[in-house]
Amino acid sequence: MRKSLFGYGGTTRAIAKSGGWDIYDDKFDEICSDENSKNNEKFRTDEFGNRLLNPREFNPQNSELEIPSPGFPPRHKLVQKAQNLISEYDYFSDFTGQKIWISGTNGKTTTTKMTQFLLEKFGAQMGANVGIPVANLDKSASIWILETSSFTIHYTKCATPEIYALLPITPDHLSWHGSFQEYENAKLKPFFMMKNGIAFAPKCYENRLKDCAAKIYFYENEIDLAKICGVNLGEISFKTPFLLDAVLALCIAKMAVGVADVELLNRFVIEANKLEEIRDKFGRLWVNDTKATNIDATICALRRYKGHKIHLILGGDDKGVDLSPVFEKLQNMDAKIYAIGINTQKIADMSVKFGINCEKCEFLDVAVEKISQNFHTNLDEVALLSPACASLDQFKSYAQRGDKFKEYIARLNLNCDLN
C-alpha cells in the first residue's frame, strides 16, 4: 500500500521530503519516477523515492492514506475517490509540544505573527498557512503556532489544539465550501473536537458552543478580550483593525505561558500590504490594503478612514461572495468606487443599485490614473486599495497586486495639473 499526496504545492511538497509517496497532480502527464521526470529541474525529488502521477492513475484500493493540498475543494475528483483522507494536521498530530491554532476570516495572519512575536522567546515556532509548512516545523519546539485555514480544518479528522483562537467570521471562500454555512461549520469544528484545552470565540456563538468540553472565553470586542488577559487597552499602540488582533494575541500568550507583555507587543511592526500608508510627492495619501481579500477586511479599512472622502479600488475574484455589505457601508460615506478585475461589471451594476458613484476601470493601473485625476490635494481624501476580492484573476498573488499598486503610484505623471 502507498501513501498519496494530492497536488504539488507548498504543503504537500514539504511532506513529500519524507519519501515513499505517490504524488498526484495535473502537471504530471505519465507515470514516472522523479529521476525520469520531464520536469526534473523543477521537481527534484528522486532521492526520496516518490512517484509523480497523473490524477487519472489514482486507485483508492492501493492507497492507505491521502493528504490533499488545502486548495483542493471537496468536489475535486481525487477527493471524491479518496477513502482514507486526512489533513496535514492529522499526519503530524503526534507533536508533543503545545499547539495553538488561530483562525477566522480577517486578521488571522496578523494575530498569528503577533503571537509568535510574544512567544518566540519561549521556544515557539510559527507555521502552516503562514511561515513554515507544518512538515518543516521543528518537532522539538515547545509550541507550534499555526495559522489555520478553513480548508485544512475541513479535512482534519483527529488533530486538536491546546489553544484555539477564533476571530470573527464573515462570508469568504464560498466557491470552495459551497455555502457560508459550510464555511462557518469548518471554522467552528475544532471547538467540538477538543476534549479539553482553552479557546476564544466571538460571543455570537456562545449558545451554539455551550456544550463543548474546552474552556471557551467569549468576546464581543477588544474590551472583553482586555479583561480576559488583564491588560489596559490604553497602553496598546495599535489602532483598529489591528487592535483586536493585538489583544487576542495577548490573551493567547497569557493562557499559553502566563504572560501578556504589552510593552513587547508594542514593538511589533505590521507587515506590508495591510493598511500600508504611502504619501506621493504631492502629499496625497494612498493606502495599500491589497491583503483585504474579503468583505470584512474591506469594511474594517473603511471604518479606519471614516470621515475622509474615499477613492476605493474594489474588485477581483469575489470567490462567490455577495459584496452587498461593502456597498451598504459605503452608502453612509463620501466615497467613489473604481472597479477592477473579473467582476468589474458586477460591481458597476451593484453601484447603480446602491446609488454609489463608480468608474469601470477593469485594470489597476487605470484605476490609479483615474484616482490621480480626481484626487484633491487636501487632508480629507484618501485613495484606498482594499479590493474585498482575491487577486488571481489578474495577478500572481495579493502581494504582487500591492507591489503593482505602489509601482503605479510612483510612475504617475507628477507634472499633471492638480485640482
Where are the regions that the model predicts?
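Short glycine-rich anion-binding loops that position phosphate/pyrophosphate groups of nucleotides
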Residues: P70-P73, G107, S150-T152, P171-D172, ...
